[in-house]
Amino acid sequence: MTDLSQVPSPYDESKFVTFDGSPFQLYQPYPPAGDQPEAIRQLVEGIGDGLSYQTLLGVTGSGKTYTMANVIAQAGRPAIVFAPNKTLAAQLYSEFREFFPRNAVEYFVSYYDYYQPEAYVPQRDLFIEKDSSVNEHIEQMRLSATKSLLERRDVVIVATVSAIYGIGNPTEYHQMILTLRTGDKISQRDVIARLIAMQYTRNETDFQRGTFRVRGDTVDIFPAEHAEMAVRLELFDDEVDSLQLFDPLTGRVRQKILRFTVYPSSHYVTPRETVLRAIGTIKAELRERLDFFYQENKLVEAQRLEQRTRFDLEMLQELGFCKGIENYSRHLSGAQPGEPPPTLVDYLPSDALMFLDESHVLIGQLNGMYNGDRARKETLSAYGFRLPSALDNRPLKFAEFEGKMRQVVFVSATPADYEKQRAGDEVVEQVVRPTGLVDPIIHVRPATTQVDDLLSEIHERVKAGERVLVTTLTKRMAEQLTEFLSENGVKVRYLHSDIDTVERVEIIRDLRLGTFDVLVGINLLREGLDIPEVSLVAILDADKEGFLRAERSLIQTIGRAARNVNGTAILYGDRITESMKKAIGETERRRAKQIAHNEAHGITPRGVVKRIKDIIDGVYNVDDARAELKAAQDAAKYEDMSEKQVGKEIKRLEKQMLDHAKNLEFEKAAAVRDQLAKLKSQVFGASGEDHIVPAA
């Protein structure tokens, strides 16, 4: 038997740091540098002083995630970090896992691979049935997140706006848990009854997440929130004799434990008495709504509503759940009309910290979720597809989210008006990079001669072995410029939205390798192009006010040259607009601060060195080359797959793994499991390991 505590650690023990009164163990591969120590000190001080809002203004490449990790560790309180999309959330999750390998770092994003909400189009009399595909891997990680919040204090949750959508009531969810301790008096029948109430399924042949099996006085439970760990409960004379964690694939016992808590298999599990109470209130609302339709002479709507609702009531009565049960969430939670639904935010303790990463994007997202959802549901209610109470199954309004905010730190290189209003003067700057790199020098030149001037600048950079990014306003302009530069002997490529992910990676690789020297694009700041070899960013028609030439967009685009020692940005325009003035002023201010810091500490800026070998298919060893090429081909294949195809591929691998296990081919099963983990990690950005809480 392997005791998990005896497994050797891949980390250097001397680099773990702890703080008084904090449950976190922070792994510091390097000490904070540049502006990081001061930013950490100010943020921790502000949190200690009870400040509701602070802003961390961190430039590209300044190590904002590392600063957040240090602040969380020193404050010693649970934290939630919001990200604007799944990709960034996965990146943050991966980084926080590196900094907190011994604490619970969790991932809470939408668990739908595909989601088509139910909707009605009155103009065409078209009803669209709800259709969705739930990703089991992400569902397991969501359950793991709420479990960690209920069990421990050393928790960091990385979430997207999915966290403001309704999930089960925390109080009722907590009431349903089953805690097992060695020596507890409980019969086998009681254990089975409790598991079935928590929506676990008995399955003697196909043992998977959310199921249990019974063999005499031994009950094996595969907890819904675990990916690779099940628990074996051995009873003797109606008493818990022993508890063991084991690998459900190989059956090998991993660890003996004294206590284990089994959580419900879904966030929407509800006690039987609550369901019966809800049935009564749903019937009352149905009668009221039918009376309204009859008075309005809307007989079709009345018949439709009665048929659909009575079918759902029958299912609730017999099974305890029905399709679309979330539309009755107000009745199940006992909330009043218009009350906000329970969300992940309600699972957070009152002293939790909130970090809003890329807050200038995130605030807009949080603001927009409620209105779109409501418009769709009002139509469903008006035409008799749903009861009016379905409108309360919704995301939080922004004002409601604000009311639930804990102490907040906005994190952005370009904070917007909302952050400025809320945080006011409480802005902590992280402008100085640990590498000593400074923001680019900015030149403003006339737009009338922009193409000729750009051509001469490109020739200078090419001679020095450096690369150039050029951003234009329109697709047509980008195509014409690419053609002109090519005719004048410049090795140039054009990056646009029609290029798929794999080709885009190849283009960036070729730019870094020097296969070509100039990359032309329209909205390069969105592409996330952090290429150290780029020493010049040219912004054509910078004086045309608009989304692509707004202050924040200009600052982000200029920042593309911030990873090179010779970084320069040229803004072509016949006048200096207000946005240009602000962007230049802010960049100059940051640059002056960075240079002063370097001079005071004798730091020589050093460029960011990213190994290009990461991209070149193994040149040293033929076998390695073949393996890397196959991995790259698999990765490219997965990138090109639709979400439905990815779901099918995961199911295929899972079936293959279980077939090997049934045939006692455990090495093959483990190999397929590793392949499955790689696929999940690539597609969802997280592999989902189990967090085991040591028995007290």
UniProtKB/Swiss-Prot annotation:
Subcellular location: Cytoplasm
Any one Gene Ontology cellular component term annotated for this protein: cytoplasm
Cross-referenced InterPro entries: Helicase/UvrB_N, Helicase_ATP-bd, Helicase_C-like, P-loop_NTPase, UVR_dom, UVR_dom_sf, UvrB, UvrB_inter
GO biological process: nucleotide-excision repair; SOS response
SUPFAM superfamilies per UniProt: C-terminal UvrC-binding domain of UvrB, P-loop containing nucleoside triphosphate hydrolases
Keyword set, alphabetical order: ATP-binding, Cytoplasm, DNA damage, DNA excision, DNA repair, Excision nuclease, Nucleotide-binding, SOS response
Chain positions of motif Beta-hairpin: 111-134
Top-level taxon in the UniProt lineage: Bacteria
One Pfam family here: UvrB
Binding site for ATP: G58, V59, T60, G61, S62, G63, K64, T65
Gene3D superfamilies for this protein: 6.10.140.240, P-loop containing nucleotide triphosphate hydrolases, UVR domain
Chain ranges of the Helicase ATP-binding domain: 45-434
Residues in Helicase C-terminal domain copies: 450-616
GO molecular function terms attached to this record: ATP binding; ATP hydrolysis activity; DNA binding; excinuclease ABC activity
Domain UVR: 647-682
Domain comment as written in the entry: The beta-hairpin motif is involved in DNA binding.
Subunit structure: Forms a heterotetramer with UvrA during the search for lesions. Interacts with UvrC in an incision complex.
UniProt record similarity statement: Belongs to the UvrB family.
Function summary: The UvrABC repair system catalyzes the recognition and processing of DNA lesions. A damage recognition complex composed of 2 UvrA and 2 UvrB subunits scans DNA for abnormalities. Upon binding of the UvrA(2)B(2) complex to a putative damaged site, the DNA wraps around one UvrB monomer. DNA wrap is dependent on ATP binding by UvrB and probably causes local melting of the DNA helix, facilitating insertion of UvrB beta-hairpin between the DNA strands. Then UvrB probes one DNA strand for the presence of a lesion.
Protein name: UvrABC system protein B
Species the sequence originates in: Ralstonia nicotianae (strain ATCC BAA-1114 / GMI1000)
Lineage, uppermost ranks: Bacteria, Pseudomonadati, Pseudomonadota, Betaproteobacteria, Burkholderiales
